């Protein structure tokens, strides 16, 4: 029996032996049955991997009894074909899974690139992370290289997604810190109190800031910032007053107020507004009447007009007002507002024309530089005659300097004011 089986196997491999010729008829019938069984197994193996025993008996039903060894051979071939078909089916399934997961991974990557904000971790919801373990378990050695490349690419995409998520989370976390702070809306009472405190002291101490914060119901930092801005505003106003004498803002305020009172300005002068906000359009009758009656279409300012604390009393240095009394003696500085200088000169001329000669005293430097009793005390009834129209030498004219302007005098009524010593 063993010898016949070996001869049949050798005959199938192509080695014809004399023993094989004796059983040629048997081998032909067995070979045909084996070929038909193999063909049927190849065609039906993809649909039904393991054929039933009834189909095998039907296939080999016509073989004689002494040829039962072909059944074992047939089962051997059937098992081999079954293993090959199962491996093909598993390879096809892995191919389909691989293509499906690769497409899903590509779509997920495109969705992540197109989406603005990523919510959650991308590795938990991307199928590429799940497909890595399944591909390692199911793929054969043929797809090992492809699987490793796809794993590395998917891991790289996961890493980039994680970096993107962390950056987006960081941006969202730093967003509330970058909220724009809106400006504080102060009431009139708060601004008036702060302005009053600023006139008293430009730099406020911290305990005083705490008191103001409690009184005005404002944060301490808001009051601190307000004082900083107010100091800068005051500095800008002082720098903007380039005419006529920026070293003495009280003199500037007095001159402009006097010009507004005489009618040279079409509306009342506010000392806290810089000079270039007042375009001089000339003196009109309506403006003069409005200045005389005090009626003005403009509302009163929130804070008082004595910004430099100079309007509460007449000017403390009357010896410097010769430019108002005699505008021809003082030329306007170069590069300054010529229209303002012209308007001030016109106002001074109008004031001089309206005042009779000899009735109002003139105490300017040029008028009293040659007077013998200029430095001594004078009474309210003693008046000096102005010598501005008289002939004077160049040496007798003494213009005031910055050192003279920086000096301050005591506040007193005009009739009780004493002449202060002047240095040339």
Swiss-Prot record:
Query: What Gene3D superfamilies does this protein's entry cite?
Result: Homeodomain-like
Q: Where are the transmembrane segments?
A: none
Region: Disordered, residue numbers = 18-65, 132-178
DNA-binding region extent: 179-238
InterPro entries given in the database record? Even-skipped_HD, HD, HD_metazoa, Homeobox_CS, Homeodomain-like_sf
Q: Please list the residue ranges that the record marks as compositionally biased, kind Low complexity.
A: 146-175
CDD domains reported in the protein's UniProt record: homeodomain
Give compartment(s): Nucleus
Polar residues compositional bias, start-end: 50-65, 132-145
Superkingdom assignment: Eukaryota
What's one Pfam family the UniProt record gives for this protein?
Homeodomain
The family line of this record is: Belongs to the even-skipped homeobox family.
Q: What is this protein called?
A: Homeobox even-skipped homolog protein 2
| Organismal lineage | Eukaryota, Metazoa, Chordata, Craniata, Vertebrata
């Amino acid at each position: 029996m063993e010898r016949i089986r070996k001869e049949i196997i050798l005959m199938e491999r192509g080695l014809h032996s004399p023993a094989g010729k004796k059983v040629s008829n048997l081998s032909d019938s067995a070979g045909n049955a084996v070929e038909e069984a193999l063909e049927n197994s190849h065609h039906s193996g993809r649909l039904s991997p393991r054929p039933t025993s009834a189909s095998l008996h039907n296939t080999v039903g016509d073989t004689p009894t002494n040829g039962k060894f072909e059944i074992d051979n047939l089962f051997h071939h059937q098992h081999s074909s079954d293993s090959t078909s199962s491996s093909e089916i598993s390879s096809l399934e892995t191919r389909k899974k691989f293509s499906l997961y690769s497409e899903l991974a590509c779509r997920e990557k495109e969705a992540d690139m197109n989406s603005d904000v990523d919510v959650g971790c991308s590795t938990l919801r991307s199928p590429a992370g799940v497909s890595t373990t399944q591909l390692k378990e199911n793929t054969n050695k043929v797809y090992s290289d492809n699987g490793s490349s796809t794993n590395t690419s998917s891991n790289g995409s996961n890493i980039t997604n994680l970096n993107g998520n962390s950056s987006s989370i960081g941006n969202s976390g730093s967003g509330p810190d970058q909220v724009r702070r809106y400006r504080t809306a102060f009431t009139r009472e708060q601004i008036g109190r702060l302005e009053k405190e600023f006139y008293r002291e430009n730099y406020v101490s911290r305990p005083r800031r705490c008191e103001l914060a409690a009184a005005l119901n404002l944060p301490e930092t808001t009051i601190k910032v307000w004082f900083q801005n107010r100091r800068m505003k005051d500095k800008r106003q002082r720098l903007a007053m380039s005419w006529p004498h920026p070293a003495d803002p009280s003199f500037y305020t007095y001159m402009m107020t006097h010009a507004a009172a005489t009618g040279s300005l079409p509306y009342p002068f506010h000392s806290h507004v810089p000079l270039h906000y007042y375009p001089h359009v000339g003196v009109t009758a309506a403006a003069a009447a409005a200045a005389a009656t005090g009626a003005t279409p403009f509302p009163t300012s929130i804070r008082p007009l004595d910004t430099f604390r100079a309007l509460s009393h007449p000017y403390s240095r009357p010896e410097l007002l010769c430019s108002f009394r005699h505008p021809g003696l003082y030329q306007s500085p170069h590069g300054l507002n010529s229209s303002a200088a012209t308007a001030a000169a016109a106002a001074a001329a109008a004031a001089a024309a309206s005042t009779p000669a000899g009735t109002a005293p003139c105490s300017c430097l040029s008028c009293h530089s040659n007077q013998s009793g200029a430095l001594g005390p004078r009474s309210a009834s003693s008046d000096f005659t102005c010598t501005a129209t008289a002939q004077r030498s160049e040496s007798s004219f003494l213009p005031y300097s910055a050192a003279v302007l920086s000096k301050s005098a005591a506040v007193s009524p005009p009739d009780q004011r004493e002449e202060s010593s002047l240095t040339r």
